[in-house]
């Protein structure tokens, strides 16, 4: 029994980058950085069971659009239920890798990511996939747009700064989450 629990826990951390769903404190910390007073095109990456999705749907205007990118189809029932419960909102679910979705330049005002970036590190390839993912997010973000990312360890900040070509706008710490998390906020400047 303990071995099964350990294996499930290890799989969750390795594949999904989480132990349990994000706490309301982490959700509020990230979502509060978004200005919902105007119509937005939002991309949520790595929705899981929808902790952030629920809050984004609640706060976004009817004129806003939410695209959800979740590679793992096992989470579809939770997300589809949220979409069905909000027929007045413009929401689309995409089951693909973020690098496949973000081919159009400057499409999004906000990109909110729950991707476990630390899991994409591969020293043998100089972190090629990690950089491809971060570059795709920068490519898909409009000039002046906001990229939000949380990490359980203060990692990958320099990778994000390298791709965006500037220092992080803000880094905050949310202790009331399992695991405690760092929230990164980065705006895109003109190239």
Model-identified regions with their sequence ranges:
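Class I SAM-dependent methyltransferase Rossmann-like catalytic core
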Residues: 2-37
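Glycine-rich SAM-binding Motif I of class I
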Residues: 50-54
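Conserved SAM/SAH-binding beta-strand->alpha-helix loop
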Residues: 72-74
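A short acidic, Gly/Pro-enriched loop at the edge of an enzyme's catalytic core
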Residues: 102-111
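A short glycine-rich, Lys/Arg-flanked "PGG" loop and its adjoining helix->strand segment in the class I
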Residues: 127-143
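Conserved beta-strand signature within the Rossmann-like core of class I S-adenosyl-L-methionine
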Residues: 143-151
